């Protein structure tokens, strides 16, 4: 009996109880109490209605971004300057190229509606990180086509000259510092 925030398509696919579901649309600002607001920003991923979340709690802004193969100007606009950013760094391009997946799956992963490579994540972070950004958490790392070291070193290549905050890595079986 816990209320859930979801867009209509996700709620239907997960068979969520409509009485316990608060629905949102793209670019809706959802208020939770007096101090917390959450903006839903659409991101391209397959044929789903995925969104990123940009939360604001008493002036601290945090973004949670996963399952996207590319980004939009709209996403950059809303994530720019967030203090905390959690974002996927799904694969290393060379490991994916030489990995065990069939060509069709590799192309889907690489596509506009697939997932971000370490390089793409670094490029995105170079656009949105500012002196206000204190924490970056890399998520959704592929176990077959990535490694924490490759992800972090690629991100640092793109933002290391100006980013002085913390980079953490969230592995599938728990966090890694």
Located regions from the model:
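Cap/insert and terminal regions of metallo-dependent hydrolase folds
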Residues: 73-171
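Short active-site oxyanion
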Residues: 1-4, 61-62, 165-166
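Short, charged/polar "capping" segments at the starts of alpha-helices
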Residues: 10-16, 145-146, 176-177
